[in-house]
Amino acid sequence: MKYLITIVGPTAIGKTALSIALAQHFKCEIVSCDSRQFFKEMTIGTAVPSQEELNSAKHHFIQNKSIFENYTVGDYEKEALAKIEELFEANDFVILIGGSGLYVDAILKGFDEFPEIDPNVRAEVNTNYEKLGIEYLQEQLKNLDPEYYQKITLENPQTLQNPQRMMRFVEVCIGSQKPYSSFLNLKKNNRNFTPILIGLDADREIIYSRINQRVDIMMNEGLLKEAETLYPNKALNALQTVGYRELFSYFDGDFTLPFAIEEIKKNTRRFSKRQLTWFKRNENTKWFDYSTDRNEIIHYIVENLKSSI
C-alpha cells in the first residue's frame, strides 16, 4: 500500500520543518503544494525553503516554473500526480506539504478538466482586470455564469476578491463560450494511494505573531528589492498575491512603505484565516498544535499505518 502523508495548515506555522522531519524518518521525498512557491522569480516573498532545508530532503515543485508561464491547478494536478506515482515506485511514502487548499484538493480528490483557452483571451481578461479592477471580473462572471457566481457568493465569498481565481473563471467562460460551472464534477477521480492528513494549528495570536515576524524577516532579507525587480511585470497572474501586490502599490505611489508593510501583515493574516477555514472542512485531518513534539506526530502516523493494514 502507498501512503501520501499530507501536511496542511496556515502560513508560518512550521509545515516545512515538520515535512523535512517526516521525510527523513520515512526516508522519502517531498512534493510541494504551495502555488506561490512554484515560480523561480519569487523567492523571498513566498518563503521558499532555505538551501539548507532543501538539502535536508529532496523537494519537488519548488521554483520549477516561471511567472511568464501560464500554470493552472489542472496542470499541477497532472504533473504532481505523475511525480508522486514515480516516487511511489521506489518508496511506500511521499510527503505532500500544502498551503494552497485548492491544490491539495486537486491531488487528494482530483480536479475537473477544462478546455484549452486561447492565450489572446487570457491576455484580454488580464488587461481588462488591470484597467478596471476586480469589479470587472465580478460583473463578467455574474453575467456569464450567474449560477456559479451565486454559489461563490453564498459558500466562499472571499473568492470574489481573488484576482487569480476570478480571471480563470472569466477566461474559461469567454474562451469556451460555456459557463465555468458546466465543466465541474464531470468525472470521477481514483487515487492509487491512501492519504494520511496532518494539520498544524495554534492560537490565533500565536499565528498572527509568527506572520508578523516572518514579514519583518522578509523585508530584512530584501523583499523590497525583489518586488522592485518584478514590478514591470506586476500585471502577471502569478504576481496578484500578498507580499508583492502591496509593494507594487508603494511603487505606484499609493502607499507609504510603512503602510505597505502593515498591509502585507494584515493581508497575510487574513490569508492564514482562509487557509484554516478551507483545511478544516476535511474531517479526516488529524490536527496537532504547532509545538507538538515531532516524535508524537510520527507515532500517530505509524499507529495509523498499523490500523490501515
Swiss-Prot record:
Keywords: ATP-binding, Magnesium, Nucleotide-binding, Transferase, tRNA processing. Its EC number is 2.5.1.75. One of its GO terms (biological process) is tRNA modification. Catalyzes the transfer of a dimethylallyl group onto the adenine at position 37 in tRNAs that read codons beginning with uridine, leading to the formation of N6-(dimethylallyl)adenosine (i(6)A). Residues 34-37, 164-168 are annotated as: Interaction with substrate tRNA. InterPro entries: Dimethylallyltransferase (IPR039657), IPT (IPR018022), P-loop_NTPase (IPR027417). Belongs to the IPP transferase family. Substrate binds at T11, A12, I13, G14, K15, T16. This is tRNA dimethylallyltransferase. PANTHER family: TRNA DIMETHYLALLYLTRANSFERASE (PTHR11088:SF60). Pfam families: IPPT. ATP binds at G9, P10, T11, A12, I13, G14, K15, T16.
